[in-house]
């Protein structure tokens, strides 16, 4: 019984500490519908499993509580592997030659901003804040 309580306490404690970005893996249409219903923008992460900068962003930026809270309040976030169909199509349409690539859309599908490459959390957040502020000024 003590072992079970310890394991539950440990599991709950580590889960609470990880307020990271919640990424959807649904279709782009489903993600857009979620954003419409929730009144949020759409954030898309185009990555590849073999990409060191992509993995660095996952470990050092998207895992942070402050980044997770900021993004979850403002975006429905989705991620697509550029080695698979949806990711490849998005990269072809909106991309450059480099990943990671981050795209921000409004609920009408208009591209509001693009962030290319890895960055530390503060720089990444500054870039997102700029995109969000520009969108707010349009309204």
Segment roles from a protein language model:
Residues 4-13:
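Sec-dependent N-terminal signal peptides
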Residues 14-19:
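Sec/Tat signal peptide C-region and signal peptidase I cleavage site
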Residues 46-62:
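Conserved redox-active cysteine motifs that mediate thiol-disulfide chemistry
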Residues 22-26, 62-86:
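Thiol-based oxidoreductase modules, predominantly thioredoxin-like and allied folds used
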